[in-house]
Amino acid sequence: MSNQRVLYWPETYNNIKELGRGVSGVVYKASHKKTGQIVAIKLVDMKQSKISTEQIQGEIRALLTLNPENERTHINIIKLIQCFIHKTTAIFILEYVDGGTLEDFMYSFERGMPLSLISHCLYQSVNAIEYMNSKKCSHRDIKPANILMLRNRKPKLKQQSEQQQQEDGGYIRYSGQFQLEPSSQENNNYQFDPDELPILKVTDYGYASISGNDSAEIHSTLAGSPLYMAPEIIHIILSPFLEPGTGKLSADSSEGYNPLLVDVWAIGAVAFRLITGDDLISVIFPNLNQTTVLAALVNLAKMIDNGDFQKGLDSIPNEIRKYGLVDPDIELGISFITSLLQLDPKKRLPLKETLNHPFLAKGKLSFTQTLNQHYKDNKDVLGSIVPSDISNFLNQNQQQQQQQQKSFSTSSLPQVNHNNDTNNNNNNNNNNNNNNNNNNNNNNNNNNNNEKDKDNQSNNSSSSSSSSSPPSPTISKSSPSSLSSSLSPSSSTDDLPKAMKWSSSVKPPKKSNFAPTFLSHQRSDKITLFPKLLPPPTKDAPPLETMNWRSPPVEVGDSITWTTLTQDAIFQVQFSVLTSFLKVISASNSYQFRIITSLTKVPLEIAVSNHKDTILYMYNIVKSVIAPQLISLSNAFDENSIRSVLAAILYQIGTETEQAEIANCWTLV
């Protein structure tokens, strides 16, 4: 199977240059062949991408919600011009934002930004998030790298010949007299000018969530970047590591979090970094074990329980004052930050009130002045185009769920409740392994969502940058007239013999005396009747003799369980760990892969195989019925053998330089 990424390019656009890339896709600067309009085109390979179909659906749904057809788009929200599906490529035509990211801009200051400039930037960011929340949309990954800036609008002009192109206001004109003179920086990023403050755009909606009713839905899936992640997410997702009987931030809190409130926390964390130049967590918890992301987050979760986290939050005012900032508005800035960084989500200042906070008063004034002086004639009112294939794609999971519910309506399987991360009641497991059966050996495992590649300064609106670049994609030109929204693996059984059925085994695995450890916090009643609940094998199924289903499922008794991206709270967002495991282990048949459900109070093993391709195929079959699932790896269920496996994996990571830095000292090994 080829590891080469194949992406289809829309024929109506000229490819100017690549802006940035990540494991989820590539972003290009392009121009429309007829109009010359400059755009950013994001291409996502749905066949090999490390993100799930649900995540792509969520991003499309969020962009469509925030870019209503034939209506003016909010100035601080990235504009969606068009989106469609062609074969295995999701294509996003987005507004081209040319001034780099707020993350890049921060580094032009030695230590923190001027408070008036911070107020200007935060007012726009809060304005955008408040608008999103009014649409029942939460971003869930607010950070400086996901906030873009328009570059300066008043550069010097210089003469140019008629043969040269003119780039002005987002268009290429093929006959003209003048050309905008590039700034001193080669990339034309926004450069600080007190007479022309920047316009910001919130982007990257890969983890966005849409609530389907008037009341905010409760979520329990991990989303966001560790340095800006709200404590309720850390605490709830990692609750299995904590002592029994704990796991709630307040007496009336439920087992989940309100996604509309996590954005408020993120804004506070961003404000802290803009003022001090340092990350919140590193400052208020200087002794935190940050050897790995997992270790750091588990320790933070424990600190929430024992009260140390609250002590860290209480230290914020004094920590900010230690920077010796000489500005009369510094106390207003401290008040602004502490009103947002509240441990109890319900005590955080609502966004509507945040917009009226005294610290943002100067920002509101400067933002209004900037619009009047430099964007008064901006008449970009293009509406988003929504082809029918996108509507079909967004409804795909809902239709599948309805069919499954109809098929299993007479089953004795207990009801399992799922939280809705999208408007169409999608399961909240965020199955990042949805396409792994087509990408088992993909080497693009540096999925760092917290550190944007500096090449993404113009418009990395979609993907976290990789710490090492994936292989260049093959761009196939194709006409949008032959669009297709088929995303899922083939499930047709027309060519299969009618007698083809799953085989099963009741042989239990060997148990140990150690208690199992799982990252999933979700528990419910027993699950039985496998594999009767499963759809029949498809024509592309691996040999049935390589599959072994447990019927009924058996309890898992060994203590070490390696999880996939699907339910692993850390790796789901940041790292493609499963592929690294498979690359090392696949050469040996002595290791057994297991599919485990953590929906039950006692984890159950429901399938095993010694073949990596088979286990991934079985995994994609299982997740259509029950989620979330885990894939475990062991050798004859001997815990000691795992150590040699781990050593091999660490060696592999070291030789391939796959170690990923997540910010100041956040490292995964």
Curated annotation (Swiss-Prot):
Which controlled-vocabulary keywords does the entry list? ATP-binding, Kinase, Nucleotide-binding, Serine/threonine-protein kinase, Transferase
Question: Which sites bind ATP?
Answer: L19, G20, R21, G22, V23, S24, G25, V26, V27, K42
Q: Using the record, list the residue span of the signal peptide; answer none if the entry has no such feature.
A: none
EC code? 2.7.11.1
Annotated InterPro entries: Atg1-like, Kinase-like_dom_sf, Prot_kinase_dom, Protein_kinase_ATP_BS, Ser/Thr_kinase_AS
Q: Mind naming one GO cellular-component term on file for this protein?
A: cytoplasm
Ranges of biased composition (kind: Polar residues): 406-418
What this protein catalyses is: L-seryl-[protein] + ATP = O-phospho-L-seryl-[protein] + ADP + H(+); L-threonyl-[protein] + ATP = O-phospho-L-threonyl-[protein] + ADP + H(+)
Q: Where is the Protein kinase domain?
A: 13-360
Q: Where are the transmembrane segments?
A: none
Map out region (Disordered) in residue numbers. 396-518, 530-550
- Is ATP-binding a UniProt keyword of this protein? yes
Pfam families membership:
Pkinase
Stretches of Low complexity bias are at 396-405, 419-449, 457-494
GO terms of biological process kind = regulation of autophagy
| GO molecular function list | ATP binding; protein serine kinase activity; protein serine/threonine kinase activity
Gene3D superfamilies (UniProt xref): Transferase(Phosphotransferase) domain 1 (1.10.510.10)
The active site consists of: D141
Family assignment? Belongs to the protein kinase superfamily. Ser/Thr protein kinase family.
Q: Which PANTHER family match?
A: SERINE/THREONINE-PROTEIN KINASE UNC-51-RELATED (PTHR24348), SERINE_THREONINE-PROTEIN KINASE ATG1C (PTHR24348:SF68)
Q: What is this protein called?
A: Probable serine/threonine-protein kinase DDB_G0291918
Organism (species) = Dictyostelium discoideum
